[in-house]
């Protein structure tokens, strides 16, 4: 299936693949084929809480903050070079739904910005490291407090 999708995307000559809520694990051949062209947004401050149920995990662990991460996609689940993160507070008595709403508001802001950087040719993946305007980003990307 990934090969057929990859062939189709290659025929279209895509510059960027934008994932949001895509719950399928991409194969290593697919991620390598489109390395530096796949972005994902994940509802946690990666590398903390890869995978599912991030809001619940943050609540269960008594975290005081949560957030969202935009990253390049590689073969690891929610792996890949981090581009930008946004943090949100977790208040006493918060529910999963409240944290999710707060996080989602930030997702809308930062994903748009990162896609803009990519389209403007300002954002690149070089040797598995994210670069913005020719400068390597820190391991956790930029943090938008």
Task: Give the role of each language-model region.
Residues 127-145:
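Short, basic/aromatic-enriched C-terminal tail that caps enzymatic domains
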């Amino acid at each position: 299936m990934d090969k057929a999708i990859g062939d189709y995307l290659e025929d279209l000559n895509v510059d960027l693949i934008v994932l949001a809520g895509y719950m399928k694990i991409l194969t290593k051949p697919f991620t390598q084929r489109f390395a530096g062209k796949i972005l994902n947004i994940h509802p946690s401050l990666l590398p903390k809480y890869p995978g599912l149920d991030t809001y619940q995990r943050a609540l269960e662990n008594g975290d005081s903050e949560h957030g969202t991460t935009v990253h390049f996609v590689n073969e690891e689940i929610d792996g890949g070079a981090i581009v930008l993160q946004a943090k949100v507070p977790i208040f006493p008595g918060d529910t999963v739904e409240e944290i999710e709403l707060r996080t989602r508001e930030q997702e809308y802001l930062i994903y748009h910005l990162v896609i803009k950087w990519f389209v403007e040719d300002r954002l690149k993946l070089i040797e598995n490291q994210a670069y913005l305007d020719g400068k390597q980003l820190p391991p956790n990307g930029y943090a938008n407090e």
